[in-house]
């Protein structure tokens, strides 16, 4: 199945002959302060096609799950917004308490293709904030809804959206002591889940390439462990080299040309980097300690990892050739699974202290550490492409791990849309 985008944005910021788009919005959402009170927003059914109700529903779900918006029940509003090019009757929408309004229209072509026009309005200033038009094939209507969600999110928060993305994860089933762990993938809102492996062997730690077209992951079989590359467009799968000992925790470099991973031999774990073209492999740590969980910086010049070389697991940063190692975490407890933000400003991690687990973030230099969650077991953070939201998995004493999301303030914590047992999430970049 082709996962490359089939959508085409055919017009951006429509001129809107009858409407005026202001230079600055009257309403905005401060994402960095956290959502104390979500913004009331009206998202009525898009006109023109039965598909319009489904598109509006997906947009509603996306914005509501972000925690920054409060979609309102507007089924009884007299203004039905039949024509996207006609200005809304704002008193009708003001009476709902909405501060923002999204309306849209779906046009179905002779070939079944869709054209979706939408507008974003400031209800009280009665000004248009945004107008876009998208075209897609009939089966990609959800992609249109995600792109509209991203556009609205960016216009009202000033940050890039993250809705037109996918999540790879480990789908778990069976008894706690004999789990079946299959590689799976889904849209970020839980739609279109599919298995990528058959469950005959255990998979762990999937990670996307920067193009979202490839995954790397660890497979554990009775004969040992291996790291695989899986092309999501062709379904071609290959092993990344042969190594003595346990191989685990793979991650792509930002340009996709390399994979960093750990190899454990005789109780010692070190980090290696493989060039995927030449298959040349370089060992970049040689300390007689456990060095693991490598993650590249967005510019590809550094790697963050965790190591117990200081006595217990802490976070370190080094150059990609292994030089310049420096410790950046100094708090009590154990730090594991560090991962660099796509923006380069924060590093997320798992912390174990006082019998509890936390998902936390710190600045890239180790400063401004903050713990965002507390639970029996929270682990495996992965960044949304805007670098302002994290997904992780949470597990209770009885097992049954679930996916959760939290923003970088820690104030917006909620279960992810996927309700099945799942661990080791990996968030893709924005799709093309």
Swiss-Prot record:
**Gene3D superfamilies noted in UniProt:** TolB, C-terminal domain (2.120.10.30), TolB, N-terminal domain (3.40.50.10070)
User: InterPro entries in the record, alphabetically?
Assistant: 6-blade_b-propeller_TolB-like (IPR011042), PD40 (IPR011659), Tol-Pal_TolB (IPR014167), TolB_N (IPR007195)
GO CC terms, sorted: periplasmic space
Which keywords does this chain's UniProt record carry? Cell cycle, Cell division, Periplasm, Signal
An example GO biological process term is:
protein import
Signal peptide span: 1-25
Function of the protein: Part of the Tol-Pal system, which plays a role in outer membrane invagination during cell division and is important for maintaining outer membrane integrity.
Q: What coarse category fits the chief subcellular location reported for this protein?
A: periplasm
What family is it from?
Belongs to the TolB family.
Q: Which cysteine pairs are joined by S-S bonds?
A: none
The record's annotation in NCBIfam families points to: propeller_TolB
Cellular localisation: Periplasm
What protein name is recorded for this chain? Tol-Pal system protein TolB
- Subunit details for this protein? The Tol-Pal system is composed of five core proteins: the inner membrane proteins TolA, TolQ and TolR, the periplasmic protein TolB and the outer membrane protein Pal. They form a network linking the inner and outer membranes and the peptidoglycan layer.
